[in-house]
Amino acid sequence: GLSPIYVNEIFDIIQKINADGTTVLLVEQNAKKALSIAHKAYVLETGNIALSGDAKELMNNDQVKKAYLSE
């Protein structure tokens, strides 16, 4: 994987692109990082949408916390 410095730089660039009015579709394994910058999110399991909704709500979802956020 990328070093944490590069990951942070890439996420900063993605946020700037989005702030300029461009929609960004992000597919990312780092759920915590992705949900922290997303507006809307989908959780996929075996290729199917298992959960969807507001990213902040998903970040606080008990299923998501247990399975993807190491909480």
Feature locations, PLM:
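Glycine-rich phosphate-binding loops of nucleotide-dependent enzymes
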Residues: 1-71
